[in-house]
Amino acid sequence: MANKEATVAELENLFDSSTAVLLTEYRGLTVAQLKTLRTSISEHATYAVVKNTLTKIAANKKGISSFDEELVGPSAIAFVHGDPVAVAKSLRDFAKANPLLVVKSGYFDGNPLTAEEVGKLADLESREVLLAKLAGAFKASLFGAAYLFNAPLSQAVRTVDALREKQESAAE
């Protein structure tokens, strides 16, 4: 009994420390395949095979009731502590290569996710790419603003220069 309580407490800690949680079914995968999957997401997540009943208890204690119906059969959870998009992409790619892995649902930013929504999360670009695009947009805007502010000044210089040339040619 104490072992089960410790497991529930550990699961609660994982739920607390995760930015997202992705629920999968791994029926039929070999130990080697599970090890490969764990390795592929280890930078951003902890992938744990879980007991359904204990996971339901821990999830419900954390206010996550969306897993109740999904926690059937052999279940494993990716507790994401990094980029949820990267983990969703890794799970999707692994599931394409190994159709026995099924992404069932998820929980992200206080909201339950369906399997389809986890797929949409995987379709997003990574945080780093989005930040780079945002920085590029800011940089382009700054260059545009600098050009806009410099345009009247350079136009005035060109006008004065043209007048000077006109006066010089008229004087000759």
UniProtKB/Swiss-Prot annotation:
Keyword rRNA-binding: yes
Source organism superkingdom: Bacteria
Gene Ontology biological-process annotations: translation
GO CC annotations on file: large ribosomal subunit
Pfam family, one: Ribosomal_L10
Subunit-structure text: Part of the ribosomal stalk of the 50S ribosomal subunit. The N-terminus interacts with L11 and the large rRNA to form the base of the stalk. The C-terminus forms an elongated spine to which L12 dimers bind in a sequential fashion forming a multimeric L10(L12)X complex.
Entry similarity comment: Belongs to the universal ribosomal protein uL10 family.
Protein name, per record: Large ribosomal subunit protein uL10
Species of origin: Leifsonia xyli subsp. xyli (strain CTCB07)
